[in-house]
């Protein structure tokens, strides 16, 4: 496999992950953060970082919308639930191990 093919495969995997997260609106960002140490916001921020590394300017909201499939605020209104005290505690504990 050459570098171009590897990049194409990695891009396809990223698109599949984003599509999966768009369909799984039942999975809350806080639960992703607790379990995996990243969430939809992180993916949007990493997208923006990758663009900046290549001299491409993209705003935070635009980058996150590319992950959410809509403006983040709209997604939050439609799908985000209030975090439970248990989730908040688990999030705080997880922050100690995730970087």
What do the predicted segments below correspond to?
Residues 1-99:
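Domain-level signature for proteins that mediate thiol-based redox and metal-cofactor handling
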